[in-house]
């Protein structure tokens, strides 16, 4: 390697986005340390103020509505370490961006609640034939917001390799739309093979949307990757890009792994879009994870889950009814399975 190549490599390391983000975060940490040192000069007065503030905060927290475990998790550190606990609580509570995101998600959930209702016939069956399962189904619908379905079958994949082969076959069958939502995406064999299929499907007129978590910008994908995807005709966005700001909002990540194809087929599980998940790349020895494929009525919940998260950062409201498949599954013999299915999910704010 000559000197010029070495300089270019050093320049790239110094000015790549992840390096700059880390440096800016370090600057903010140093600033806080300087502030703490300044406070030490007036420690007694400052400690007294924080002790009084902590006492007020404890009274406030105890009297607010909410989960008792959440309250205890704050009350203990505030009482044990008044300076740190009180300031940390104020810092977390003042995270406006987190509150705005939570409010946006709650608004979308209220809007889409009408699409997530258990069929009355299924409710009647459960009430009469399986009271225990009926209680569980009622709990999921009332508190989690997800209904119970029939006419659905599932296939289990014991490895990422098995899932990838089935996923490619199903993607090739797409006629209307393909939705993908993942936590980790990395260029390589797995993502490369899927991307080639998506490119072909775009040319065939299939709508393709792709959403991934912003942590991928550190080392896995360039910050401009959504722009590249959009140039291919794939609607793409990052959820919560990493920014050089000290904030609890950075911890709200989208860990979901969802694929929806034409509203009748879905994939989920623990497999991300990176080569270590199919053992083409070794990180921590042989990678063992699982996934499932769902076909039938229950895919409706996966479709809505994806659109809800996509809608979080959109200014306009999504037309959900356009993507909720209205195919009658009752007469589809290959979907006749005994039992019921309740797909459910969380969100980055949970």
Q: What is each of the regions a protein language model found here?
A:
Residues 2-38, 120-350:
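Charged, low-complexity intrinsically disordered terminal segments
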Residues 42, 55-58, 135:
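Short alpha-helical transmembrane interface motifs in multi-pass membrane proteins
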Residues 31-43, 63-66:
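Short, hydrophobic transmembrane alpha-helix segments
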Residues 44-48:
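Membrane-targeting alpha-helical segments
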Residues 50-122:
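Transmembrane alpha-helices and immediately adjacent membrane-cytoplasm interface residues
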């Amino acid at each position: 390697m000559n000197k010029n190549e070495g300089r270019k490599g050093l320049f790239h390391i110094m000015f790549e986005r992840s390096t700059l983000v880390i440096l800016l975060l370090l600057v903010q940490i140093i600033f806080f340390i300087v502030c703490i040192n300044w406070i030490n000069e007036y420690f007694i007065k400052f400690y007294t103020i924080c002790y009084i503030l902590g006492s007020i905060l404890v009274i406030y927290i105890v009297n607010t509505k909410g989960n008792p475990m959440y309250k205890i998790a704050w009350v203990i550190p505030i009482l044990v370490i008044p300076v740190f606990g009180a300031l940390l609580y104020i810092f977390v509570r003042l995270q406006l961006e987190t509150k705005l995101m939570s409010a946006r998600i709650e608004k979308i959930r209220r809007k889409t609640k009408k699409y997530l209702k258990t069929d009355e016939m299924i409710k009647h069956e459960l009430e009469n034939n399986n009271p225990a399962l009926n209680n569980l189904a009622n709990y999921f619908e009332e508190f989690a917001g997800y209904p119970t379905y029939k006419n659905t079958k599932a296939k289990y994949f014991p490895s990422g390799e098995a899932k990838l082969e089935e996923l490619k076959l199903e993607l090739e069958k797409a006629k209307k739309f393909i939705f993908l939502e993942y936590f980790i995406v990395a260029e390589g064999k797995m993502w490369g093979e899927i991307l080639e299929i998506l490119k072909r499907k775009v040319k065939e007129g299939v709508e393709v949307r792709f959403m991934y978590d912003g942590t991928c910008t550190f080392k896995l994908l360039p910050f401009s990757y959504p722009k590249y995807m959009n140039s291919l005709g794939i609607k793409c966005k990052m959820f919560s890009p990493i920014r050089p700001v000290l904030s609890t909002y950075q911890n709200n990540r989208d860990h979901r792994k969802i694929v929806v194809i034409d509203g009748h087929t879905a994939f989920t599980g623990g497999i991300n879009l990176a080569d270590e998940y199919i053992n083409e790349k070794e990180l921590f020895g042989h990678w063992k994870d699982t996934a499932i494929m769902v076909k039938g009525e229950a895919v409706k919940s996966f479709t809505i889950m994806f659109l809800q998260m996509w809608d979080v950062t959109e200014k306009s409201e999504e037309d959900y009814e356009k993507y909720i498949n209205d195919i009658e599954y009752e007469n589809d013999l290959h979907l006749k399975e005994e039992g019921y299915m309740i797909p459910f999910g969380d969100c980055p704010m949970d």
